[in-house]
């Protein structure tokens, strides 16, 4: 799979133009991956940048979802390690939730890989706009007390979010954070830390299935993975130092811009 154009003819000017355009696309997606990982390591939502960006350069939906999962694994590994090293990964049932997220994502990925590209091209913009509206309208809970009656429901929620990540993905991290705050009453930093682990699990499950089915564009994924590592390291360090105060304004701005771009497209 070549991005974004296939070379036709043998004239040097055509070849030079092709190389220039392909290199430009790689450079743009590298930058996008860096900022997506930076944002995602703080509060989730990085897929709201990478997914539409890859679609806009002409990649098929399944190639987009597969390559996005591959490169995202590198960012989530980096941010998970940073939060763990700084003592924020304290959730006692983290391995249980990780398993739920992994299984849910696997089921979602198996489903999405059976859907035609034409259907995905119609569904993905709708899901993106819905996720963007969610970030804009939801103010987020503060001071929520732990609700023991909803723990069983929470297990289903973790599975469902994992399924969503395997089926589509953008906004998964933010949904996990909100679930831990609203249902379990965890604080924002602990919620963010466990979210990175669950997101890593769901990303990896989806990546394995997509890789087996041959949808991953490896060279593009590796280029974006380098940016993911740098962005996740920078973002998680920034979040650990500054906390929640900068997260929501960034997400709202990004969501608005993406919604406008998708509607125009």
Task: Give the residues covered by each predicted segment.
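Selected transmembrane alpha-helices and immediately adjacent juxtamembrane segments
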Residues: 15-60, 143-192
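Residue-level signature of transmembrane alpha-helical entry/exit and packing/kink sites
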Residues: 25-29, 93, 97, 121-124, ...
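Membrane-interface alpha-helices at helix entry/exit sites of multi-pass transporters
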Residues: 60-68, 91-93, 185-196
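Residues within membrane-spanning alpha-helices of integral membrane proteins
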Residues: 26, 69, 125-128, 132, ...
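Selective hydrophobic functional segments
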Residues: 66-119, 203-249, 253
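Single conserved hydrophobic/aromatic residue that forms the stacking wall/gate
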Residues: 1-16
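Transmembrane helix exit motif
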Residues: 78-88, 117, 125-150, 259-265
């Amino acid at each position: 799979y070549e991005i974004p154009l296939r070379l036709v003819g043998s004239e040097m000017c055509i070849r030079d133009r092709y190389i220039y355009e392909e290199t430009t696309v790689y450079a743009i997606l590298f930058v996008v991956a860096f900022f997506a990982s930076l944002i995602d390591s703080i509060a989730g939502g990085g897929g709201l940048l990478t997914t539409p960006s890859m679609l806009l350069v002409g990649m098929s939906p399944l190639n987009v979802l597969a390559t996005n999962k591959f490169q995202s694994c590198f960012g989530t590994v980096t941010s998970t390690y940073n939060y763990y090293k700084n003592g924020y990964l304290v959730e006692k049932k983290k391995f249980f939730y990780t398993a739920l997220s992994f299984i849910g994502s696997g089921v979602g990925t198996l489903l999405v890989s059976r859907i035609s590209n034409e259907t995905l091209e119609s569904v993905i913009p709708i899901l993106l706009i819905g996720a963007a509206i969610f970030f804009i309208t939801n103010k987020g809970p503060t001071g929520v007390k732990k609700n023991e009656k909803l723990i069983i429901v929470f297990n289903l929620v973790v599975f469902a979010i994992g399924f969503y990540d395997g089926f589509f993905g953008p906004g998964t991290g933010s949904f996990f954070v909100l679930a831990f705050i609203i249902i379990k009453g965890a604080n924002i930093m602990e919620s963010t830390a466990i979210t990175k682990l669950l997101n890593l699990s769901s990303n990896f499950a989806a990546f394995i299935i997509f890789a087996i089915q041959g949808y991953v564009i490896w060279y593009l994924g590796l280029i974006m993975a380098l940016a993911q590592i740098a962005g996740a390291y920078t973002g998680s360090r920034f979040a650990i130092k500054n906390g929640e105060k900068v997260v929501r304004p960034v997400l709202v701005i990004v969501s608005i811009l993406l919604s406008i771009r998708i509607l125009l497209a």
